[in-house]
Amino acid sequence: MQPMLNIALRAARSAGELIFRSIERLDVISVNEKDAKDYVTEVDRAAEQTIVAALRKAYPTHAIMGEEGGFIEGSGEGADYLWVIDPLDGTTNFIHGVPHFAVSIACKYKGRLEHAVVLDPVRQEEFTASRGRGAALNGRRLRVSGRKSLEGALLGTGFPFRDNQIDNLDNYLNMFRSLVGQTAGIRRAGAASLDLAYVAAGRYDAFWEFGLSEWDMAAGALLVQEAGGLVSDFTGSHEFLEKGHIVAGNTKCFKALLTTIQPHLPPSLKR
């Protein structure tokens, strides 16, 4: 395992242990609303602090971008490295006791994704990847599914629910209608990093969502790519981290999904 990936995995494990211990005291955990329907808990903040401390100890000059703590500037040659952290992806699930959430850590070098960890503290599943070295689950090599069409495919998605996404709800429902009849099912589980990890593991055949932040997608996207899948924004370009919308899947299902949803895109998502 690459040294940077090993450091990231150890940091994710520490955060995951903190999160898992917190499940038993959900009734007393402090919850705040950052924005409409966007929650943060003391556990999110503590988990991010744990990760940042581990990364800063190993790589004090690297830049860090965390969902809760914002941007920490790097210095010297270390500024070319950027760690992208979501300490608790699926906070709403966590708050409600739904056991589907994850720690997500990605490392970029000069803007390119290099390492990724998505850790599920409940199922003790550790999804890891390094550029050019493949993706793994608990040390076992991952490959995307071999399904050749959307017929019988299982898809993952995220349902628009925030106020700034409601204007696109009808477009999303049209996408849903065009897909639900030809697939085995569509799942909306509430943690994009895990959804993408499931694509990498072949559990989902493809995934799409809009209105995401970089920390929601970065680690999961590299997992899919290193497992042999494709990832893009809704126009088919590679600017998904910048644009905040993503399509991912095995080669065949990715292309079929992209072709199916594109006619239903609002103008704001066609750019």
From Swiss-Prot:
Gene Ontology BP terms: inositol metabolic process; phosphatidylinositol phosphate biosynthetic process; ribosome biogenesis; signal transduction; transcription antitermination
Instruction: Using the UniProt record, name the top-level EC class of this enzyme in a single word.
Output: hydrolase
Q: Which Pfam families match?
A: Inositol_P (PF00459)
| InterPro entries in the cross-refs | IMPase (IPR033942), Inositol_monoP_metal-BS (IPR020583), Inositol_monophosphatase-like (IPR000760), Inositol_monophosphatase_CS (IPR020550), Inositol_monophosphatase_SuhB (IPR022337)
Mainly resides where? cytoplasm
User: What Gene3D superfamilies does the database record attribute to this sequence?
Assistant: 3.40.190.80, Fructose-1,6-Bisphosphatase, subunit A, domain 1
Please list the GO terms describing molecular function.
inositol monophosphate 1-phosphatase activity; metal ion binding; RNA binding
The EC number(s) given in the record are 3.1.3.25
GO cellular component terms, semicolon-separated: cytoplasm
> Which controlled-vocabulary keywords does the entry list?
Chaperone, Cytoplasm, Hydrolase, Magnesium, Metal-binding, Ribosome biogenesis, RNA-binding, Transcription, Transcription antitermination, Transcription regulation, Virulence
The prosthetic group or cofactor this protein requires is: Mg(2+)
Task: Report if keyword Membrane is assigned.
Answer: no
Q: Where does Mg(2+) bind?
A: 67, 86, 88
Query: Subunit structure, per the record?
Result: Homodimer. The rRNA transcription and antitermination complex (rrnTAC) consists of RNA polymerase (RNAP), NusA, NusB, NusE (rpsJ), NusG, SubB, ribosomal protein S4, DNA and precursor rRNA; S4 is more flexible than other subunits. Interacts with the ribosome and with RNA polymerase.
The entry's family comment says: Belongs to the inositol monophosphatase superfamily.
Q: What is this protein called?
A: Nus factor SuhB
